[in-house]
C-alpha cells in the first residue's frame, strides 16, 4: 500500500458497518494501480497499426478500460454516501452510480458524460477491434471517445467507420481522469 493510501486508511471511517476500516483505502489504491497500468501501456500503444496485432491490442486496451471502470465501481461501493449502499450496486454503470456524489456539492455531470463515452469506446475497442459502428445516440454520425487530444478540453470524436486508436497521450489522459475521480471520491469520505 502506498504512503498516501496508508494515510487515507488511517483516517477513514468505513461507511458500511460490515466493511473493514481499510476498504476505502484499498479500493482507492487498487484504482490508482489500475490507472498506472493503463498509463504504462502508453509505449505499447504507439503505433497501433493494422491486422491481427491491432485487433489484439484494441481488445486488450478495451479490457483494461473495463477493469479500470470496475475498480472505480468498487471504490464507489465502499465509499457510498447513500444511506443504503447495497442499492447502489444494483446500478448498471459507474456513470449512473457516481450520481450519489451530486449531494456532496460536486457537479458530477462532466464525469458522467466522460464515463459514458469511455464505456462506448471500450465496447467498440473490445467487440469491434476499435471500428466505430454506431454513434453516441441512434442516428448519430459521431462517437465521442473518452479521451482528449493534446491541448483540447473536448473529448475526441470519431466518425462512423473510423478506427479508435488510443495513443500514448490518450492512455495517460484516461489514467489521469480515473485517478482524479478516485482522489475526489476519497476526499469526500467521512472524517477525511
Task: Describe the residue ranges of each PLM region.
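Short acidic alpha-helical/loop segments enriched in Asp/Glu that coordinate divalent cations
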Residues: 73-94, 132-139
Amino acid at each position: 500500500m502506498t504512503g498516501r493510501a496508508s494515510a487515507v486508511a488511517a483516517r477513514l471511517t468505513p461507511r458500511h458497518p460490515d466493511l473493514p476500516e481499510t476498504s476505502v483505502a484499498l479500493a482507492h489504491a487498487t484504482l490508482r494501480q489500475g490507472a498506472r497500468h493503463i498509463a504504462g501501456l502508453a509505449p505499447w500503444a504507439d503505433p497501433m497499426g493494422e491486422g491481427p496485432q491491432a485487433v489484439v491490442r484494441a481488445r486488450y486496451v478495451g479490457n483494461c478500460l473495463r477493469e479500470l471502470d470496475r475498480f472505480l465501481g468498487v471504490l464507489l461501493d465502499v465509499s457510498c454516501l447513500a444511506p443504503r449502499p447495497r442499492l447502489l450496486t444494483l446500478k448498471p454503470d459507474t456513470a449512473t452510480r457516481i450520481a450519489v456524489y451530486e449531494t456532496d456539492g460536486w457537479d458530477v455531470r462532466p464525469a458522467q458524460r466522460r464515463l459514458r463515452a469511455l464505456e462506448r469506446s471500450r465496447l467498440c475497442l473490445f467487440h469491434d477491434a476499435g471500428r466505430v459502428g454506431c454513434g453516441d445516440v441512434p442516428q448519430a454520425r459521431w462517437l465521442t471517445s473518452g479521451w482528449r487530444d493534446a491541448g483540447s478540453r473536448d473529448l475526441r470524436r470519431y466518425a462512423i467507420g473510423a478506427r479508435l486508436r488510443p495513443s500514448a497521450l490518450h492512455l495517460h489522459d484516461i489514467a489521469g481522469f480515473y485517478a482524479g475521480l478516485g482522489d475526489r471520491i476519497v476526499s469526500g469520505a467521512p472524517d477525511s
